[in-house]
Amino acid sequence: MTENKGTPEVGWSFDTRYTDLPSMMFSNVEPEPVEAPKLVILNDSLAQSLGLDPVALQHQNSIAVLAGNEVPKGAAPLAQAYAGHQFGHFTMLGDGRAILLGEQITPNGERFDIQLKGSGRTPYSRQGDGRAALGPMLREYIISEAMHALGIPTTRSLAVVTTGESVFRETVLPGAILTRVAASHIRVGTFQFVANAGSEEELKALADYTLARHFPEVEADRENRYLALLQKVIKRQAELIAKWQLVGFIHGVMNTDNMTISGETIDYGPCAFMDVYDPETVFSSIDTRGRYAYGNQPRIGAWNLARFAEALLPLLADDQDEAIKLAEAEISNYAEQFEHHWLNGMRAKLGLFNEESEDLSLIKDLLEVMHKHKADFTNTFRALTFDEQEETGLHDKLEFTEWHERWQARLGRQEQTKDDSHNLMKMSNPAVIPRNHRVEEALEAAVEQEDYQVMERLLKVLANPFAHSPEQKAYAKLPAPCAIPYRTYCGT
């Protein structure tokens, strides 16, 4: 491993504040070099927003950085330690196949983690090889960028590099490394790790770092600033999970190590988007009991946040009973905050600007009709946007006809015009989502044929989900019956 000195001016501007934290929270480790790195996809617009030159990033020396073969100046590679409740069971974890290069400082002073996923073994790899297969890395690229375009807080994908090496899973697969960009990789599980294995001073150091990085508006001398940290994280997660529900996104593995403190969606292993509306929808092959089903996600969010509150207890009050009382009061606010964001989002999807007491029943009645008649979630709301009742597949159902009349009457009680409602719905109801069969089609072409054009076309369509353009229609079609039920795998 060598420090890279010959790369053209890419624009790397690394800082390494995470290394100021107690050493128990990370291990210094360099990426393992790969045989023949090749850049297969680069996110030009994200690169530019980070202050990086997309042309220079395609230079061979820059590709070596993205592959982990060279370390850029100022970087301090490390793997982060964390814990987590995985399907409800607590375990000590850590970055087993991901290495944080450092924090990129953008031209406007923002700070983003730059992480290489699939870059080799770390002290936390256990029995893993530290590597990643091409398919799951491309999948994360597609889904994370689609989520960003949908306006949902998420980690981002800067690039995918193939390694020229094979990884061995159920079959032999081409290896790859994803460059992931995040506001940070601090998780609920990070706090759980320190609370279980560290001292109160180490926990305080992590909390202070997190407040400074993500919530600088919380003053250092504020009374009980750690309670403010809990409040801020609850608020962000309530809003995030509401946004998931509004587009039919199913994370698939909502373990506490996959809940970020920043409020970004992270870890796209077994995730997928719901086609037919059903609250019990599960895609993950390992979620055999439906713990992380679509309809359970809000409740799991509350459960995870309760684990975060438990980790913070020593900082909330000297008296444990008082600390528990404070934590419980904040956790009890989560459900109301979630419903507020979800209800406002559903109103927007139906073109409603103001609030009425019957709105919740109007929304739930529509969802019940959709569930009963197996209507597509995304396409139903898109059809309502353009008043194309036949496109819903519900137009000949009496329950829907009666509901539609109620909805029209509700719209008529607003000051806003029908055009206003139509425009609000266009901005709130995507024409396209990353349909599972379309994602698989793109991955199959890339992995099996080294054809990235299918993926590039898909990414182009997904980049403007609210455009409602003619070319998006083909990507809005449902999967063939033979593609159902769809199953996802974590890719590890």
From Swiss-Prot:
Ligand binding (Mg(2+)): N258, D267
GO molecular function, one term: AMPylase activity
Assigned keywords, A-Z: ATP-binding, Magnesium, Manganese, Metal-binding, Nucleotide-binding, Nucleotidyltransferase, Transferase
One of the Pfam families matching this protein, by short name: SelO
Active-site residue numbers: D257 (proton acceptor)
Cofactor(s) the protein requires to work: Mg(2+); Mn(2+)
Catalytic activity: L-seryl-[protein] + ATP = 3-O-(5'-adenylyl)-L-seryl-[protein] + diphosphate; L-threonyl-[protein] + ATP = 3-O-(5'-adenylyl)-L-threonyl-[protein] + diphosphate; L-tyrosyl-[protein] + ATP = O-(5'-adenylyl)-L-tyrosyl-[protein] + diphosphate; L-histidyl-[protein] + UTP = N(tele)-(5'-uridylyl)-L-histidyl-[protein] + diphosphate
Residues at which ATP binds: G94, G96, R97, K117, D129, G130, R180, R187, D267
Entry EC number(s): 2.7.7.-, 2.7.7.108
Protein's job: Nucleotidyltransferase involved in the post-translational modification of proteins. It can catalyze the addition of adenosine monophosphate (AMP) or uridine monophosphate (UMP) to a protein, resulting in modifications known as AMPylation and UMPylation.
Recorded family membership: Belongs to the SELO family.
Xref: NCBIfam families: PRK00029.1 (NF000658)
Name the UniProt record assigns to this protein: Protein nucleotidyltransferase YdiU
Annotated source species: Halalkalibacterium halodurans (strain ATCC BAA-125 / DSM 18197 / FERM 7344 / JCM 9153 / C-125) (Bacillus halodurans)
Lineage: Bacteria, Bacillati, Bacillota, Bacilli, Bacillales
Gene this chain is encoded by: ydiU
